[in-house]
């Protein structure tokens, strides 16, 4: 996994602030491959609380860009009925 512990902590802190303490955040995509360089940060948000929608995602991306630097960050929800969300849950890594 190509995220530093501080980056993981920042992602989790922002996610908990926006989505609540029970949120689960999965990293998926190219950042899981240690042999690659660069790439965006692909996150899947899983929460039991009411779905927050696109505005919550925009807030989270804005806060992460401010705290982590200007990186490409993509966020999807686990409720999305898409192949990408299904693959992210299947192959992604839960951030702790």
Language-model-detected regions and their locations in the chain:
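Catalytic core of pol beta-like nucleotidyltransferases
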Residues: 1-26, 32-38, 47-96
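Short glycine- and acidic-residue-rich catalytic loops of nucleotidyl-transferase/cyclase enzymes
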Residues: 41
């Amino acid at each position: 996994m190509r995220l530093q512990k501080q980056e993981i902590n920042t992602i989790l802190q922002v996610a908990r602030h926006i989505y609540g303490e029970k949120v689960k955040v999965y990293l998926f995509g190219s950042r899981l491959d240690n042999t690659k360089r660069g790439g965006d940060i692909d996150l899947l948000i899983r929460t039991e609380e009411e779905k927050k929608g696109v505005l919550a995602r925009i807030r989270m991306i804005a806060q992460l860009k401010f705290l982590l630097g200007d990186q490409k960050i993509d966020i999807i929800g686990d409720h999305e009925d898409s192949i990408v969300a299904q693959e992210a849950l299947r192959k992604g890594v839960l951030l702790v």
